[in-house]
Structure formats: C-alpha cells, structure tokens
Amino acid sequence: MKIRTRYAPSPTGYLHIGGARTALFNYLLAKAYGGDFIIRIEDTDIERNVEGGINSQLDFLAWMGIIPDESIRNPKAFGPYIQSEKLKHYEKLALDLVDQKKAYFCFCSKEQLDADRELAEKSHQTPKYKRHCLNLDKKTIESNLLQNKEYTIRLKINENMEYSWDDLIRGKISIPGSALTDPVILKSNKIAMYNFAVVIDDYEMQISHVIRGEEHISNTPYQLAIAQALNYDITKIKYGHLSIIVDETGKKLSKRNLSLKQFVSDYEKDGYWPHAITNFVALLGWSPKNNDEIMSLETMIKNFDINNLSKSPAFFDINKMNWFSTQYFNNITQEEFINFIKKHSLTKELVLNDYTFINKCLLFKSHIINLKQLIDLVIEQFNCDKKVLASDVDYIKKNQLITVVRVFYEQLIINDEFNEEFIKEIIKKVQIITNNKGANLYMPIRIATTFSSHGPELAKTICYLGREKVLKNLINILKILD
C-alpha cells in the first residue's frame, strides 16, 4: 500500500508553529517511504475564514521547503482539495445514513440543548445529547420537514461498542461508546461538521496515515464511528497523535501568548534563514537515532522514523531556534547570503540605496540570527553620528596607547590610497613603529576609527566607513586624548 499523508489546515489565519510541525512530520513520513503528501483545505467554518488564508498557509509551508504532491495548486485525481467544493457530496452521504437508520434528523432548538447542557454541568456530568429526536416517528419527521423546521443530522453512536486504535505514537487507545454523544454530522445550514467531512476526505483521498496534535485524540472515536457507518474499512488509516508544544513556563503554547512569536510569518518577516526554522520545528518531539541536530531536508527524510516521535511535551526554546539560524547563516555560501539579502523585503531597498550595504552585511554573516538584527548591527557599526564612549577613551589613556592612534592617523593622512589591503599595511606599520601587538594594537585603532570597542573584521570595517569619516573620527578622538 502506498503511503499517503495529509495536512489539512483551516484558512482562518497564519501558519502556526504547531501546524507547521504537523505538516512537516506528515511530509517526512510520506517522503521517507516514497509516498505522497497532500494538502487539502478545510474551509467549512465560513465565519472564521480569512481572506488570503489559503495562500498564506501554502506560501509559508513552501517557504519552509514543504511542497505538497497534491493541493489546490497542483490538483490530481483525488480532488477537490477544498471542502467548500464538496458540500453537496457531504450532504448526500449524511442523508444516505439517515435512510439507513444510522443517523437521524434532530429538530432540537438551541434553547433546549443549552438547558440540557446546563443541567448536566450542574450535576457534574459530561454533557451528552439526550436523544430527544432519535425515535421520532415518520409522520412527525415529515411534518417538521414540510414546515421547513430547522434541523441537524446526528450520527447514532453504538453505546455498546469500544472504539479503539493502535496509535502510532501512544500505543493502544480505547474509548467506550457509552462515553460518546451522538455527534452532529450536518449542521442546520447544510454544511458538514469537521469530523464528518474529514472522514470522507481521508477515505476518498486514500490517506493511509494521519499524524496530528493530541487535541484530536477526542475526535478519533467519532471519526471511527462515522467511518464504520459509511462502511469504510477503518483499519486502512493509521493515526498518530503528537505531544503538545510548551513554552518556557511549561504551559501549552497558546496563540494568546503575544510575548512569544508563534507564527511562521513572524520568522519570515524578521529574516530568519528558512531551513533553520524547518530544522528547529523538526526537533519539536522528534529525536533522530543518530542525535543529529543540523539536517538538510533530504537528511530528515532519510532519518525520519515515526517510532522516534515522543509522547512527552516538546519545549519551544526560542534561544535554540536562534542558534539554528546563526548556524545556517554561518554555513551558507556567500552567494546564497547575498541573494537572500537582495530578495528579502527588509533589505532589498537598502541594497539598492547603498552600494556598500552588501559588503557591510558580509562582515556580520557568521554572527547574525536574522536580517532584522543584521540591519541593526550595520546601522550601529556605520552610524555617522556615533559618539565615542568615555570608557573607551579611558581605556586608551590608561593603557598608554595614544601613540598607536597618532601613528595610525599620521600614516593615513599622508596617503590618498584607501582600501582594505592598504589599511592592513598601515596597521602592520603601526605595529612596527609602536612595538604593540594584539589588543594593544587593534583595540585603540578600532576605538579611534569606528568609535566602538567591538565589531567585525577591522580593516574591512574601516574601509566601508570611508576615508573621510575615519579621518574625522581620528581627529576628534586625538583632540580628546590630547
């Protein structure tokens, strides 16, 4: 049997880290066994859908390198890949179940259902539908339908049955039918409920494996019951439920926690290296046997084993994510780095407006987390209005290094040449003349030329500051030192 997995987002917002992980694990599982990965859109919750939500999901998955074999953008034989195009189909199947006595019309009002729920909660019981409409006679049903009385369709749960499955991550899970309620499968607006549409789609798209969050464990027995009612072979789909992702406090990652960036778009916007995010997300609950951390997508596919997915909560460590991004920026080629800067919305205008901008950026390539930080570093280092710190002036005075600054200035002023190699030569001359080396040579030159005690490669930094600015800084600091 060919492995076919799916990720089925609702277009209700941006791609969340949790959704990205679900998509990635389904993608890796399919690719590890030469199978297909499908993205379908579950857009039946019309009130919550947002404009552009579908493209947003697909675009940010593509940014992470997760490209589906089938989707609304590349449809194949198993479409439609969007639920709103299948509403009549779902409705027909729900009505078929009514004809087969496996489901029934429910005419209960919202007020009655709310009253039943309130009563159950007061009695400390789990709210369950009281089956008021289960045994309505044919005459009553026909009368209600003729009067256009609003109805839903509910599945009749077999209370004597045990709904169980061998979870790919958690082992055997079993839930008695007596613990379930008769679920609504078709709403009063004729739109299929989530659990009903999902079962039909998974069956008709020949999905073989479903990896999803643990919040879906409670949906699984209902989906098994629906599949049985539709005469689907429930052994054909394997389910695996991922652990939750927790924040630094140990609480489940919540979209309401605004202090933590949880959407892939946040990281794209800040200019993180895309695969750094993919790599980080891959290790949220997966431990490769060889304990590799830095992995290409190809390596992930080769190493992926569903048996290595953890039941324990996965810790969302932003510091670890930043570490991954720094590693990737350090290891990518100069050409890849330059192309990234030229194309990203944060930096492409800066590239056009300053011909030295790319060279300035290259100074920080091996140290940055993202492009947002890179811009700050470039601005800080090459800020024309920067003032020298009193503590840096004191450093030069205390260590009696004024001569280093003066000799560097004298060597620079007598030459019109100004490039990286020339600056390196001057530094060598200063070393010979003053007999200083190491920090006693480089620190006073850095402070005097850049007005900063730290920074990237010195000769390049001086070069990109420009001769005029460097001379101005040297004159100003010599006045202070004298």
From Swiss-Prot:
Write out the GO MF terms.
ATP binding; glutamate-tRNA ligase activity; tRNA binding; zinc ion binding
A Gene Ontology BP annotation from the UniProt entry:
glutamyl-tRNA aminoacylation
Question: What catalytic activity is recorded?
Answer: tRNA(Glu) + L-glutamate + ATP = L-glutamyl-tRNA(Glu) + AMP + diphosphate
Q: Where does ATP bind?
A: K255
Could you say which enzyme class this protein belongs to? Answer: ligase
Q: Where is this motif: 'HIGH' region?
A: 9-19
The UniProt keyword set, sorted, is: Aminoacyl-tRNA synthetase, ATP-binding, Cytoplasm, Ligase, Nucleotide-binding, Protein biosynthesis
Taken from the UniProt entry, a GO cellular component term is: cytosol
As for subcellular location, the record says: Cytoplasm
Q: What is its EC number?
A: 6.1.1.17
Q: Where along the sequence does the record place the motif called 'KMSKS' region? A: 252-256
Which Pfam families has this protein been placed in?
Anticodon_2 (PF19269), tRNA-synt_1c (PF00749)
Record's function text? Catalyzes the attachment of glutamate to tRNA(Glu) in a two-step reaction: glutamate is first activated by ATP to form Glu-AMP and then transferred to the acceptor end of tRNA(Glu).
Q: Which family does it belong to?
A: Belongs to the class-I aminoacyl-tRNA synthetase family. Glutamate--tRNA ligase type 1 subfamily.
> How would you summarize the oligomeric state and partners of this protein?
Monomer.
Q: What's the protein here called?
A: Glutamate--tRNA ligase
Originating organism: Ureaplasma parvum serovar 3 (strain ATCC 700970)
Gene that this sequence comes from = gltX
